[in-house]
Amino acid sequence: MTENIHKHRILILDFGSQYTQLVARRVRELGVYCELWAWDVTEAQIRDFNPSGIILSGGPESTTEENSPRAPQYVFEAGVPVFGVCYGMQTMAMQLGGHVEGSNEREFGYAQVEVLTDSALVRGIEDSLTADGKPLLDVWMSHGDKVTAIPSDFVTVASTESCPFAIMANEEKRFYGVQFHPEVTHTRQGMRMLERFVRDICQCEALWTPAKIIDDAVARIREQVGDDKVILGLSGGVDSSVTAMLLHCAIGKNLTCVFVDNGLLRLNEAEQVMDMFGDHFGLNIVHVPAEERFLSALAGENDPEAKRKIIGRVFVEVFDEEALKLEDVKWLAQGTIYPDVIESAASATGKAHVIKSHHNVGGLPKEMKMGLVEPLKELFKDEVRKIGLELGLPYDMLYRHPFPGPGLGVRVLGEVKKEYCDLLRRADAIFIEELRKADLYDKVSQAFTVFLPVRSVGVMGDGRKYDWVVSLRAVETIDFMTAHWAHLPYDFLGRVSNRIINEVNGISRVVYDISGKPPATIEWE
């Protein structure tokens, strides 16, 4: 019998902050399971979840507006600790009898909070001291409204010059509100405050660890599928690879992985996937060489969105054909992860539907009545990677840069041809190899090469040549929502350019993309 790793759990109610998923990831990093729900859940749903504590997230709305989001009143009647962050603090104050006002000045950026009163939330936590020995905390503020009167049974724990109630608390009820964001790294002691709330005040044990998550997933897979057969589309990406390893641990040869080689992968990627999962780990893999089929379906198509749809459609066709060849397969496994199933908290109806359906493989034939196995659906991407390491997958594979689902289909601009893909594969491999050699690979968030369907004159020896152009792209980003182009050293870029032009026959010019996001996107298509 495996340990119940969901025994202690935190419920996070999402009021729409850009940082809400970060709050959840921080709680998980503390070894405690949590779920992220839209703010307008019912009392029955909260009772059913039975949380050890509740966190109210930040959000873009103003509590002073008439129909702004509110926490269900039951949150404050459930008898568990509650932690309000930014908007979460404001709605807590309003709902419990305090007062919030719009402020003429937005407080955005660093602030120093002075701790005035002892509180379980911040006891012994400080960044520096005032002249008279009071603790100071360096925090990150991002708010317009502010609490102007706290509920009568609360005390002021900390303040700033422009924010009289930066932290408020009701120690008896274990209700806490902070006007700053403890989940962001700019709040230097934020993780310690979250740990204090989750581990000490809510008394949650650290049961949510990679080894225990694996044991739990394996037990749940066995319970769900029994002796039935399972099929999985293995791409070699992080999610499908970790899904494959978990299923292999749970059911061994009853798992069949289908690896569709679409001709749009990186250099030697198909061989690497087969070597690692087939030869090294001993998984049962069907290798389907389908390059010709994908390229002929893409012939003559220039539109990026149409190319994506074609690649998706052909993948489903090929996968379905392979699935139908297998006898007695009852289950389809997918690498769905937690962000895929979190619905935005901004529910237009005012009622939340927390889970949305998400299908990586798309429409399976009607005659294939299969159940769905999704062993990663509670996990964030960083947790999936940690589990992959625990399962023995190589670090370089788990932590490599993102690669788009359609592969080189959207990195060859315009029409996709085998000649273009072959040139691009080799040029891209040189760029990545040089980044690793120069110890720059992990310093950029994503790097790749793009094939441009334009010819350019070049000189080789005594002759002129008229060949293709590629662009190098490297960006630095935290969340991939915005990104800066990476300022790679000129001598490094020169070395990469020389190698590509000299070693890849058919490329005569290399350019470097210096566009940020926005206005450009990270991928060209």
UniProtKB/Swiss-Prot annotation:
InterPro entries: Class_I_gatase-like (IPR029062), GATASE (IPR017926), GMP_synth_C (IPR001674), GMP_synth_GATase (IPR004739), GMP_synthase (IPR022955), GMPS_ATP_PPase_dom (IPR025777), NAD/GMP_synthase (IPR022310), Rossmann-like_a/b/a_fold (IPR014729). It is an enzyme of class 6 (ligase). Keywords: ATP-binding, Glutamine amidotransferase, GMP biosynthesis, Ligase, Nucleotide-binding, Purine biosynthesis. Residues 9-207 form the Glutamine amidotransferase type-1 domain. Residues 208-400 form the GMPS ATP-PPase domain. SUPFAM superfamilies: Adenine nucleotide alpha hydrolases-like, Class I glutamine amidotransferase-like, GMP synthetase C-terminal dimerisation domain. ATP binds at residues 235-241. One of its GO terms (cellular component) is cytosol. It holds the Pfam family NAD_synthase. Pathway: Purine metabolism; GMP biosynthesis; GMP from XMP (L-Gln route): step 1/1. Its EC number is 6.3.5.2. It catalyses: XMP + L-glutamine + ATP + H2O = GMP + L-glutamate + AMP + diphosphate + 2 H(+). GO terms for molecular function: ATP binding; GMP synthase activity. It comes from the Bacteria. The active site is at 86 (nucleophile), 181, 183. Coiled coil: none annotated. HAMAP family: GMP_synthase. Homodimer. Catalyzes the synthesis of GMP from XMP. This is GMP synthase [glutamine-hydrolyzing].
